């Protein structure tokens, strides 16, 4: 009897796995797209179609080198990298996926072309909130400085307080903010303590009442990952300037 139920359970898992994998794919691509466009009216199949048409990706190592296969010779797929598991590794041992969005079609641009063809760069991030993990996709415009949009998520932040990071109200505050200052130094974006702050500069967003620790977690997460991605960003910002100056 035990063997029978064990076999039945195994078969059930095998049957459900493709469904679960498809749901994970939809959820991942939904979050990535959600950082750059409004996806509220898109059903799952439209999300997949839009993603496949308008997005390409690349995976880097800590030295900003493109990596395409792992140590076992298997292809590395950006969308399949588990950012949570990746986060547990030392920064120099992680993989860093980057997603590039084109408002026309992914067939019309190459991964290594910048400025003229890539509308937005999306960077996945992971960190800690008050109670559990927080994560996000932060999109930069083609200047690789201005925030196009963000899509934050969390596991267990306090409802009505830290959990607000996943709301449009909070996420919209990040739009048009700058991560570099006029000297080209990485400043990142800081969520201020408290809400309804009167003085907010281009590197700051208004805070959330009663959620200082969650806000601090966001600040640390964003700064840490942009520090890791900074080599790639600086290189592609330079390429973008060169391409623009030639036109």
Q: Model regions: which residues?
A:
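Flexible, solvent-exposed loop/hinge segments and secondary-structure transition points
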Residues: 1-247
